[in-house]
């Protein structure tokens, strides 16, 4: 008796693996065990084989031309009998219902090998014709290059089944692991969940809650309830889109205790069926839990062994004794980085950093291995290695002075000794001093010219790059373009480095002079340090204000801004008759100048303002509603600075006054040069990103990788592919992408490593979120003087939450960078978890004349939006009155 070509997945044990494929067989097992699985049919592997024999000549199947086979499959007519069977199955699932069409290769999601993601999956498919097209696309995906590679490696049959399954229009969804993805512990179940559809969890687009439960008892061991500003759901056209979460649900748990118990019970049952650890996709609709997919875990979880910041170090003394810090490493690498961001930092470390720092006056730049370090997705500076090299230079000969400025209170230097040695001595030191002196003279003579050259380079290269048609360039031409970017990236970093180091040195000298000569000037030393440079980040804000002024002058254009959300304006403004001229004129001019800016710019996976201008448009909407007179604010800050400075200088000795004024002038000049040259190398990093996206666009058409894989691509593997030294299947192998994706997931689940560390680190699961309402005050670093009482606004995702910010609120964030500056113009004060005297939040707050306290470590965990804060920027304290207390008192 012939097996039907389309069968219902009903739990019937007569349905075999070679009929249903791995995914279909997995679902059938779950249904047989009585587990809740949405209704599904399977277009069997035999249906594929019958189709392929009829429509694709045998010669094409054997000559290895994958593209020809794919095209034949996609453009052939499905035999009428099979078309009827597929149509009947679709209607049986519900009249014109929305379904998922998933490939189910013979070894996919099987016990021997997990092929999850090798073949195609289509969600929210509606209509018989659309279903038929997607079935053919799944068949064709068997012949995608990345799938073909794995098919040959596993020696599986060239056949594929297709699953037609009802879509669960989820209230909440996510992923569940029957072993801890960080520690590898098998006695825990770890659940990541979000509001809405689960696509946001898998792609990393949305913030998730995390729950850890005891597998045997179901007891809740830990939970991380995060602010969830957005969620995935279908729009009115049936497309999956990112929407804003209703305010009332943003901080609520996305799962109830009863739903958690359902999930952990199902996890135990599914594990018994498979006799192995699983990761399970699930959804909740109307309080019922559905299992969507169960996969054997093929990437072994890492046990929580100690790790070292320098993965290349072989010397035990250096491994145990080197001091690493991420204090003052620059906002381009602050915070958790994706695997792409980390691999780009390693590219920078190996090829750029050494030659760049040589321009600071280092005769010996040592070896790239001692420059930087990495722990759990965070980037560190090797302070021991840097101090060792800087001993060549007279101003930094005292290495502990340099070393301790990067330390936190937890670091004990009592027994510390630089593991790399004492540095140059004797005649070698004399030669290095002479080299340093010559380089300083050269830098001083060329400084003004260097700044002009870097500004011109940025403008010229931006204009040239925007004129390129990347889609028309061959891979070899793209490689040549990348090599050009390499040259200018190095040149611009080398130009920036002397200004960067001299700014630090002058700031430290200024701070010491203030401490010596301003004994009782509580907080005033911070104020006289303000207004010492023409910050480019402030130029950005002034540029946005200028755009707003243009919009204000055009009534119809202003109405468009007022009537539409920022994400709607992104698609509307370029095509609308009212706004097209503005978009192509003033707004384009702004993007030419500032469009390469963004967040964490060394993480190439994060869009820049030109890639996604929705944040800029949101700020413009805010400024239209709440006008900002930034020039007035800056004048007031400058006037106050002058008054304070005059009062302080009048009480000083002539020598002290001369020294302080000289340092202020020198620091201001150097900081201005630093800020003027920085955008050039930032722009070069955007060029890298653009070419990566173009390459991924081409690989998507070949079925190898897509833009969704960008965060998990290894930058140097990408470069090797474009250079022609390795094939795409190797550079973008699914195994590599999956490994990087899993590692990033581990990092998200791990407790954030310390800001500074000596020796090994033991990864830890995140501690329960602090929500102790008894904590009434926090103390950190006094960063910008002044006092203010105002409501808090906690923002952890700038791109999504910017529109929530209201004028005269205190901005509370993990850290800030240049992309946050426009919000400072509206803020009453600034509070951050991470920061130092030269971090973005401190410098810009002082420029804008608003109080700031940084390095509070847990402010974003303890403070909630709506809490009333008393912010003292002179003493570094924040007093909290929680919203619940105010409501009770009221």
Swiss-Prot record:
Disruption phenotype: Cells lacking this gene show a white phenotype and produce 4-hydroxy-2,2'-bipyrrole-5-carbaldehyde (HBC), 4- methoxy-2,2'-bipyrrole-5-carbaldehyde (MBC), 4-hydroxy-2,2'-bipyrrole-5-methanol (HBM) and 2-methyl-3-n-amyl-pyrrole (MAP). It comes from the Bacteria. Its EC number is 6.4.-.-. Disulfide bonds: none annotated. One of its GO terms (biological process) is antibiotic biosynthetic process. InterPro entries: ATP_grasp_subdomain_1 (IPR013815), PEP-util_enz_mobile_dom (IPR008279), PEP_Utilizing_Enz (IPR051549), Phosphohistidine_dom_sf (IPR036637), PPDK_AMP/ATP-bd (IPR002192). One of its GO terms (molecular function) is ligase activity. The keyword Nucleotide-binding applies. It is an enzyme of class 6 (ligase). Pathway: Antibiotic biosynthesis; prodigiosin biosynthesis. Keywords: Antibiotic biosynthesis, ATP-binding, Ligase, Nucleotide-binding. Pfam families: PEP-utilizers, PPDK_N. The mechanism for the condensation reaction is that a phosphoryl group from ATP is transferred via His-840 in the C-terminal phosphoryl transfer domain to the oxygen atom of the aldehyde group of MBC. Belongs to the PigC family. Involved in the biosynthesis of 2-methyl-3-n-amyl-pyrrole (MAP), one of the terminal products involved in the biosynthesis of the red antibiotic prodigiosin (Pig). Catalyzes the transfer of 2-methyl-3-n-amyl-pyrrole (MAP) to 4-methoxy-2,2'-bipyrrole-5-carbaldehyde (MBC) to yield prodigiosin. This is Prodigiosin synthesizing transferase PigC.
